[in-house]
Curated annotation (Swiss-Prot):
Sequence positions that bind chlorophyll a: M683, Y691
Protein name as it appears in the record: Photosystem I P700 chlorophyll a apoprotein A1
Family: Belongs to the PsaA/PsaB family.
Residues annotated to bind chlorophyll a': H675
Entry's localization field: Plastid, Chloroplast thylakoid membrane
Mode of membrane association: Multi-pass membrane protein
Known function: PsaA and PsaB bind P700, the primary electron donor of photosystem I (PSI), as well as the electron acceptors A0, A1 and FX. PSI is a plastocyanin-ferredoxin oxidoreductase, converting photonic excitation into a charge separation, which transfers an electron from the donor P700 chlorophyll pair to the spectroscopically characterized acceptors A0, A1, FX, FA and FB in turn. Oxidized P700 is reduced on the lumenal side of the thylakoid membrane by plastocyanin.
Binding residues annotated for [4Fe-4S] cluster, in chain numbering: C573, C582
Pfam family, one: PsaA_PsaB
Catalytic activity as recorded in UniProt: reduced [plastocyanin] + hnu + oxidized [2Fe-2S]-[ferredoxin] = oxidized [plastocyanin] + reduced [2Fe-2S]-[ferredoxin]
Gene giving rise to this polypeptide: psaA
Subunit structure: The PsaA/B heterodimer binds the P700 chlorophyll special pair and subsequent electron acceptors. PSI consists of a core antenna complex that captures photons, and an electron transfer chain that converts photonic excitation into a charge separation. The eukaryotic PSI reaction center is composed of at least 11 subunits.
Cellular compartments per GO CC: chloroplast thylakoid membrane; photosystem I
């Protein structure tokens, strides 16, 4: 850290009125490209228009202009998010049974969508309890609203209006910061200021304001709700905020005001800032006093972090200095040159952010069931399954996106002349060793993980159960995972003496939390079946990484195509006369990576769904006997491929297949329709472009005969376009099929 004299002059970091506001461009599709602006001569035009409309790099080379467009587009994105969020709250206010659910969350199911009768589809309005007919929702909004302290549909309505106001504000900001006061490039590149503001402002003050809301509004309201007070009798949020005596009745330390804070007797506040661990036995969620404490602690951390970087005051860290000092004995120039990359290539910046956010999203998926954060979330099995599946899918897509933008960076923004012997250069120079080793790992994992299943299927088919890998024959116990579980389960008495319970009930310890005779959470046993499927996870993840990493490391050149960088991010083949060079572009690696990402996530969500139904979810009798939904069949059935097909896919598909004529029938139709969408994708993936061009020309001939030929000449999709349409339908069909299968099943039995 260095101290230097502050710079006296104030920098002007915006440009006034750079681009005049005009609707003329809206009337000219493709205005950003000379070729596209001419209008369509063939049907390829509409595909190119969609491919390039948001590729700001292709509109201009001016980094400042690109940065402004991205910045402005982000405000548009935020506006859409606020409108969507507002819609969710509006549905809660106008079409939901939220108030009824709030009064009896264990027997009434959440619903916020009522279908209008047009052709008989009002059959979808099932009886969710409390005299309400509607579609059961599994988004978790009701649980989130209760945790926030929302007690009436009027409050939801007000929040929905607030969301629209914010959306309008964002749309205005997007226009203002592009047309009226656009930031200069230097502003986008001022990383120290950006870090300070994002860390202290967004994360620090954001967490602090949420902690404040939790303490002053959520905690008292939830305390009263847990005690069984009628929501209509509970004081309104502003009464708690303005009247300290009301809060002091529930949390005595409030009567002392800020004195304990300034006299450093912070433990006085332990009545509302707790460190209990475990779950609230009334709601089956984390103690909200624990989460308030957590957000306050996070706020302090980020407020400190937001004061670490050197800006106008000449004190603090410089990011460039940190990176350039970061070198070890074996890493050459270390991180030298990365600062220049991250301040001039938004693709590089985005790739890192997507990789981290994707990983974080997957971590969130796992925490949502292991440490259910909201009241009555853990016993709403449909919502638990939906939240896990949703966050896993999102995480998978973000990680593939990280590889895509890393490859775009390599092709468009990487300058080999400025990167010498730093870590990026060194990784690129031994890429052959990396990829060949990774390939070996994939082969090893694939043969061994699959081989264990094949062995079990064979022994099972031959009637030799004693020779199978199972918990009752040849055991392959996940000893490392069990060791980690045990250390965490024992922590409260040993390594974490102040904690009253372990971080998650899933670690072990024998406690069962049941809410309304349903299991919220209990210790999750791991055995041979988990060991087998874990290695399938390892296999699919490593193959996904192999494909994506190969795409990035060979994006600029390879032995096959040394001048690949000149061909761009996506290209079908290396020109005529060079056979065997198709499907090698960085784009094609992203395309292939998406399929393996789909494989990976499918195995994970299947594992989760079956494991939870078999070993966690279920009912508990007054004698304390737990009856699981599928009766603990995971350990015995998930050790063969046949078991997965017969006892998971087929057995649990009965609800979606037999849903016709019931309120779940929409899932039956989706299941069928999504299979069709998936099958439709194969038509694009398995067929060549020439086949379609030939067919089109024959059809055009017939139109010419009848003098009804179109002015815009029809053309077959290019190879790349066909693959894009194919993978989109493959993923859409696959995801919607899984969605229908999961929800019909879990709503029927959960």
């Amino acid at each position: 850290m260095t101290i230097r004299s502050p710079e006296p002059e104030v920098k002007i970091v915006v440009e006034k009125d750079p681009v005049k506001t005009s609707f003329e461009k809206w009337a000219k599709p493709g205005h950003f490209s000379r070729t596209l602006a001419k209008g369509p001569s063939t049907t390829t035009w509409i595909w190119n228009l969609h491919a390039d409309a948001h590729d700001f790099d292709s509109h201009t080379n001016d980094l400042e202009e690109i940065s402004r467009k991205v910045f402005s587009a982000h405000f548009g994105q935020l506006a859409i998010i606020f409108i969507w969020l507002s819609g969710m709250y509006f549905h809660g206010a106008r079409f939901s049974n939220y108030e009824a659910w709030l009064s009896d969350p264990t027997h009434i199911k959440p619903s916020a969508q009522v279908v209008w009768p047009i052709v008989g589809q009002e059959i979808l309005n099932g009886d969710v309890g409390g005299g309400f007919q509607g579609i059961q929702i599994t988004s978790g909004f009701f649980q989130l609203w209760r945790a926030s302290g929302i007690t009436s549909e009027l409050q939801l309505y007000s929040t929905a209006i607030g969301g629209l106001v914010f959306a309008a504000l964002m749309l205005f900001a997007g226009w203002f910061h592009y047309h009226k006061a656009a930031p200069k490039l230097a502003w986008f590149q001022d990383v120290e200021s950006m870090l300070n503001h994002h860390l202290a402002g967004l994360l620090g003050l954001g967490s602090l304001s949420w902690a404040g809301h939790q303490v002053h509004v959520s905690l008292p309201i939830n305390q009263l709700l847990d005690a069984g007070v009628d929501p209509k009798e509970i004081p309104l949020p502003h009464e708690f905020i303005l009247n300290r005596d009301l809060l002091a009745e529930l949390y005595p330390s409030f009567a002392k005001g800020l004195t304990p804070f300034f006299t450093l007797n912070w433990s006085e506040y332990s009545d509302f800032l707790t460190f209990r661990g475990g779950l609230n036995p009334v709601t089956g969620g984390l103690w909200l006093t624990d989460t308030a404490h957590h957000h306050l602690a996070i706020a302090v951390l980020f407020l400190v972090a937001g004061h670490m970087y050197r800006t106008n005051w000449g004190i603090g860290h410089s990011f460039k200095e940190i990176l350039e000092a970061h070198k070890g004995p074996f890493t050459g120039e270390g991180h030298k040159g990365l600062y220049e990359i991250l301040t001039t290539s938004w693709h590089a910046q985005l790739a890192l952010n997507l990789a981290m956010l994707g990983s974080l999203t997957i971590i969130v998926a796992h925490h949502m069931y292991a440490m259910p954060p909201y009241p009555y979330l853990a016993t709403d099995y449909g919502t638990q399954l939906s939240l896990f599946t949703h966050h896993m899918w999102i995480g998978g897509f973000l990680i593939v996106g990280a590889a895509a933008h890393a490859a775009i960076f390599m092709v468009r923004d990487y300058d080999p002349t400025t990167q010498y012997n730093n870590l990026l250069d060194r990784v690129l120079r031994h890429r052959d060793a990396i990829i060949s080793h990774l390939n070996w790992v994939c082969i090893f994992l694939g043969f061994h993980s699959f081989g264990l299943y094949i062995h079990n299927d064979t022994m099972s088919a031959l009637g030799r159960p004693q020779d199978m890998f199972s918990d009752t024959a040849i055991q392959l116990q996940p000893v490392f995972a069990q060791w980690i579980q045990n250390t965490h389960a024992l922590a409260p008495n040993f390594t974490a003496p102040n904690a009253l319970a372990s971080t998650s009930l899933t670690w072990g310890g024998g406690d069962v939390i049941a809410v309304g005779s349903k299991v919220a959470l209990l210790p999750i046993p791991l055995g041979t079946a988990d060991f087998l499927v874990h290695h399938i996870h390892a296999f699919t993840i490593h193959v996904t990484v192999l494909i994506l990493l190969k795409g990035v490391l060979f994006a600029r050149s390879s032995r096959l195509i040394p001048d690949k960088a000149n061909l761009g991010f996506r290209f079908p083949c290396d020109g005529p006369g060079r056979g065997g060079t198709c499907q090698v572009s960085a784009w094609d690696h992203v395309f292939l990576g998406l399929f393996w990402m789909y494989n990976s996530i499918s195995v994970v969500i299947f594992h989760f769904s079956w494991k939870m139904q078999s070993d966690v979810w279920g009912t508990i009798s007054e004698q304390g006997v737990v009856t699981h939904i599928t009766g603990g069949n995971f350990a015995q059935s998930a050790i063969t491929i046949n078991g997965w097909l017969r006892d998971f896919l087929w057995a649990q598909a009965s609800q979606v297949i037999q849903s016709y004529g019931s309120s779940l029938s929409a899932y039956g139709l989706l299941f069928l329709g999504a299979h069709f969408v998936w099958a439709f994708s194969l038509m694009f993936l398995f067929s060549g472009r020439g086949y379609w061009q030939e067919l089109i020309e024959s059809i055009v001939w017939a139109h010419n005969k009848l003098k009804v030929a179109p002015a815009i000449q029809p053309r077959a999709l290019s190879i790349t376009q066909g693959r894009a349409v194919g993978v989109a339908h493959y993923l859409l069909g696959g995801i919607a099929t899984t969605w229908a299968f999961f929800l019909a099943r879990i709503i029927a039995v959960g």
